[in-house]
């Protein structure tokens, strides 16, 4: 699973996901890509599940780039805990994804293989996505 080696602060505010993505919204590395259409937090487990599914489907020859990185810690309190006594401890990491952001990119394979692999990865995502081809 992906996570930062070290961060400046252990805990973060939740923040807001307003507007569309201004960074990472173009295809840079491959020829095909999976683009987010909704804002969401995508966990490191979901990113890894999608990457594994794509790798299994493409086998050799294709190259996959993961364009998002989970750098935001999400804290959870222990169950059945009373209110107060501070913020919970960090449990997992998420990537903040806005609409328009490329999640995965792929190259070195035929379009039909890429479409199939990316659709399998898209089913692992908690948001609506679309398949994009570099023209």
UniProtKB/Swiss-Prot annotation:
Listed InterPro entries: Ribosomal_uL16, Ribosomal_uL16_bact-type, Ribosomal_uL16_CS, Ribosomal_uL16_dom, Ribosomal_uL16_sf
One Pfam entry name: Ribosomal_L16
Subcellular location: Plastid, Chloroplast
GO molecular function: rRNA binding; structural constituent of ribosome
Superkingdom assignment: Eukaryota
Keyword annotations of the record: Chloroplast, Plastid, Ribonucleoprotein, Ribosomal protein
GO cellular component terms attached to this protein's record: chloroplast; mitochondrial large ribosomal subunit
GO BP of this protein: mitochondrial translation
Family as reported in the entry's similarity comment: Belongs to the universal ribosomal protein uL16 family.
Quaternary organization: Part of the 50S ribosomal subunit.
Protein name stated in the entry: Large ribosomal subunit protein uL16c
């Amino acid at each position: 699973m992906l996570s930062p080696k070290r961060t400046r602060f252990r805990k973060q505010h939740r923040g807001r996901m307003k507007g569309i993505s201004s960074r990472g919204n173009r295809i840079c590395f491959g020829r095909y890509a999976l683009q987010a259409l909704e804002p969401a937090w995508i966990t490191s487990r979901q990113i890894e599940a999608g990457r594994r599914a794509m790798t299994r489907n493409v086998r050799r020859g294709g190259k996959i780039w993961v364009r998002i990185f989970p750098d935001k810690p999400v804290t959870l309190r222990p169950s059945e805990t009373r209110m107060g006594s501070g913020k919970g401890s960090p449990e997992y990491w998420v990537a903040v994804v806005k609409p328009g952001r490329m999640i995965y990119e792929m190259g070195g394979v035929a379009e039909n293989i890429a479409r199939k692999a990316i659709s399998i990865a898209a089913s692992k995502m908690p948001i609506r996505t679309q398949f994009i081809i570099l023209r």
